[in-house]
Amino acid sequence: MFKLKQLHELIVPWISGINVKIPYLTGLELDSRNINFGNLFIAIQGYNTDGRLHIDDAINNGAVAILSESYNKSTFFIKKIVNNVEVIPIIYFNQLNKCISNIAGRFYDHPSLCLKLIGVTGTNGKTTITHLLTNWTSLLGERSAVMGTLGNGVLSDINPSCCTTCSAIETQKILKQFVQSGVTFVAMEISSHGLDQYRVDSLYFDVAIFSNISNDHLDYHNNINQYRMAKWRLFNELRVKNYVINVDDCVGYRWLLSLSNAVAVTIKNNLPRSWSGRWIALVKADYYLYGTKIVFKSSWGNGFIHSQLLGEVNVSNILLALGALLIMGYSLKSLLYTGSKLYPVCGRLEVLSCLNHPTVIVDYAHTPDALKKILIFAKHLCNKGRLWCIFGCGGNRDRSKRSLMGVIANRYSDYVIITNDNPRVEDPKLIIDDIICKIRNSEKLKIIEDRVYAINMVVSKACSDDFVLILGKGHEKYQNIGLNYISHSDQDIVKSIFK
C-alpha cells in the first residue's frame, strides 16, 4: 500500500492557493469511463479524442476533482456545484500534458527510484532488447519485469498492453505495482509517441539504449526529422545516468559524440576514431538456422556467446543489451556464462520447421529497414531453394513506407505474396495498390488478400528446401479488419499445415 495524496500535493508549484476541501484522492484517470469514486480526472486533448468534452461524465462517475488542459495559455480555477451540495474543483492548466508524468509520479511515490530501470528506444529491436535484458537479469537472480509491445509483467506472467508505451499514469501505476511485488529490475520499451507525449518524463533511468532509426510513424510525426527529435528527447531531456548507442546507425553515431557516460556498440567496426569512452565491437559472427556464435571485444574484456537468437539484427540487439548490463555493474563473466541461455522472443525471427515442409520464419518486421534485413538474412540461409515472402502493411498508418517495402520484397525474394495485415478501416485494395505502385517487374508477385489462404497456399506449395517468410504480425493473435478483431495467428496456421 501507499499513502493516499491530497490534490495540492500533486500540483504545487504549478498551482497553489486552492482552498477547496476534497477527500484524499483514490486514483488518477485519463478516461472518464474508468472513473471510480474519489478519482482525479485529468482531461487532455488526445490524438483521437478530447478528454475535456467528458468532464461532466467523469463527475457523474465519481471524480472529486478535475485537472484540465486549458483552452488558452492561462491557468485558472473554477468551482462546479453538483446537486447544489458538492463542490468539484476544475483546474484549467496550461501544457498539462507535460506535467502528468510528474503528477502521477508524486501520486505513486516515484517508483522508478526504487528500481533498476532501462529504457529502450529505436525503430526496430525494442521488444527483443527489453526481453533480452529481462531474461538475462532473471538468470542472474533479479526479479525482473518488462514493459512494451508484448505486454507488462515478469516473463512468466505478462499482461497484454494496448500500446508499446503506456500512458504517463499507467506507467507510474505499473511501476508501483512492480515495486510492491518485489520486482527489482525493469526493461521498458519507449516509443516515439510516448516520448512526444511526455509519458515517461518523470522516470529515473539507469540506462537509455538507442537501437536504430528508419522510416516509420511518419503519419504521426510528419517527417523523419520530427521522428528523430522525439527519440532524442530520451537522451537529451530526461533523467538518465548512462547511455548505450548503436553507432552503426548514422543517427546514433552523431548522437554518441554529444553524450557522456555512453557505451558505443558496433557490429561493423564503426567506432569513432576520437571515441575514448566505453565500447563493444563485434569481431566475428557465425550464422546458423538455429543460432549464432558471437565473438566480441570490449573495454570490459573479450568473449563469445553462443546465442539461440538468429541473424545480424540480433547480434546488435544482444551486444546493446550486454553493454547496458555491463555499464550497470553486472560482471562480464556472469553475463557470458548465462548468455547461451537467452531464448528468442515470440514472433521475432521465430523458426517453424517440419520434415518434408519448407522452413518458415515468422517475424514482426513492418518497416522497410527490418524487411530488408530479414530478407538478406534468409537469402543467406536459403542457398538451395527459393525464398517466399508473405507480407502486407497496416491500414490507417504511415503510407510513405508501403511502396518502399514493396520494392524491397520484390528485389530480395524469389516470390512475393501481398496480403492483408490489419487493414483496419482502410480499403485493403488501396493499401495493396500503395505497396505495388513502384514495382517494375511483377512476374514473381501475387496478391492474395485473405492472409489465411495466402499462408496455406504458399506453405503447402513450397518445397522442403524453400524458406517462407511470414512478416508483419509476429506475436499478434488477431487480424484487425474494419472495427473487428478477428482471431488470427500466423504460427497456428503454419502448425496446422505441418500436422
From Swiss-Prot:
Protein's pathway: Cell wall biogenesis; peptidoglycan biosynthesis
Any GO BP: regulation of cell shape
UniProt keyword annotation of Transcription present: no
Chain location of the short sequence motif Meso-diaminopimelate recognition motif per the record: 421-424
Entry-linked InterPro entries: Mur-like_cat_sf, Mur_ligase_C, Mur_ligase_C_dom_sf, Mur_ligase_cen, Mur_ligase_N, MurE/MurF_N, UDP-N-AcMur-Glu-dNH2Pim_ligase
Modified residues (N6-carboxylysine): 231
Entry binding sites for ATP: 122-128
Location, primary (coarse class): cytoplasm
GO cellular component, one term: cytoplasm
Domain of life, source organism: Bacteria
Post-translational modification: Carboxylation is probably crucial for Mg(2+) binding and, consequently, for the gamma-phosphate positioning of ATP.
Annotated SUPFAM superfamilies: MurD-like peptide ligases, catalytic domain, MurD-like peptide ligases, peptide-binding domain, MurE/MurF N-terminal domain
Entry's family note: Belongs to the MurCDEF family. MurE subfamily.
Function: Catalyzes the addition of meso-diaminopimelic acid to the nucleotide precursor UDP-N-acetylmuramoyl-L-alanyl-D-glutamate (UMAG) in the biosynthesis of bacterial cell-wall peptidoglycan.
Protein name in UniProt: UDP-N-acetylmuramoyl-L-alanyl-D-glutamate--2,6-diaminopimelate ligase
Species this protein is from: Blochmanniella floridana
Gene for this chain: murE
